[in-house]
Amino acid sequence: MATLSNHNQLDLSNGSHPEEYKIAALVFYSCIFLIGLFVNVTALWVFSCTTKKRTTVTIYMMNVALLDLVFILSLPFRMFYYAKGEWPFGEYFCHILGALVVFYPSLALWLLAFISADRYMAIVQPKYAKELKNTGKAVLACGGVWVMTLTTTVPLLLLYEDPDKASSPATCLKISDITHLKAVNVLNFTRLIFFFLIPLFIMIGCYVVIIHSLLRGQTSKLKPKVKEKSIRIIMTLLLQVLVCFVPFHICFAVLMLQGQENSYSPWGAFTTFLMNLSTCLDVVLYYIVSKQFQARVISVMLYRNYLRSVRRKSVRSGSLRSLSNMNSEML
């Protein structure tokens, strides 16, 4: 026990991950990869190929699914690293995946803010309902926020301070530890303002006005289905932001202000897990927004039930055949 404790302390002092974290990360990321890949591939296919009447919220959902897929496709490299304990994919690719940890929540929050503003227009400003069908503006908004986020993330590829330099065997601590980003704290806190606080305040502002309008009965002209759908979207977005993104960014700010050297942070690891969970929780949004996605999920579930029933029947028929054969042999 003493040897294990000393080994873990040595790992933490060197900035590497304890074995418990690696095992938990392997299990967690495996589940996220399998569920998230199926959910977001299905969503992207539904929104881009089977949805005939596209609206602004459809465009936003396509971008959410695409962003989730980009992030999810990086998970197998993480899992390989945690399983093998070394990084064979090169230093530059490690930088890219490390930057992706910051890129994903930054862009995701803006996309969720766009969806919140879209629901604000649908409930509080129904006279501008035609704007909700103007997909051109939605495409420009999404393209602009993609470019803006990429531009502010590129400097992370050029960091001088690198926790993985001169490591043997090669490591890639950047994909889970964000403490090495202290070297660019000015950029970090600028990013916190523009990619966390501003979209968060936009969402809160939209929700406050929407709730105020609902309580004062200013939305009586809206169809009940539109109200119900919008409220479900709002509640889902609020829960997702509070669970997945707020803890991550609070931890990010705290770690950037701490004066200690780079080391493994259990709180940082946990909030990073929560942030990754967002790629799967988006399924609730997809299910609420799109009837086609609902139908697709239901068809998959029915098909699985059908396969199970076929297997049960085949097992039963096989057991009956074997029983009849035994009886014939006895006779």
Curated annotation (Swiss-Prot):
Cellular compartments annotated: Cell membrane; Cytoplasmic vesicle membrane
GO molecular function: G protein-coupled receptor activity
Effect of deleting the gene: No visible phenotype. However, reduced number of CD8alphaalpha gammadeltaT IELs has been reported. In addition, GPR18-deficient mice display impaired resolution of infections and diminished responses with RvD2.
Expressing tissues: Expressed in the eye including cornea, retina, iris and ciliary epithelium (at protein level). Expressed in spleen, liver and lymphocytes with highest expression levels in intestinal intraepithelial lymphocytes.
Glycosylation sites noted in the Swiss-Prot or TrEMBL record: N14, N188
Cytoplasmic compartment segments: 48-56, 117-138, 213-236, 290-331
Residues modified as Phosphoserine: S322
Disulfide bond recorded as keyword: yes
Annotated function: G protein-coupled receptor (GPCR) that plays a role in diverse physiological processes particularly within the immune and nervous systems. Becomes active when triggered by various endogenous ligands including endocannabinoid N-arachidonyl glycine (NAGly), delta-9-tetrahydrocannabinol or resolvin D2/RvD2 derived from the omega-3 fatty acid docosahexaenoic acid (DHA). Upon RvD2 binding, facilitates the resolution of inflammation, aiding in tissue repair and homeostasis.
Protein name per Swiss-Prot or TrEMBL: N-arachidonyl glycine receptor
Organism: Mus musculus
Encoding gene, per UniProt annotation: Gpr18
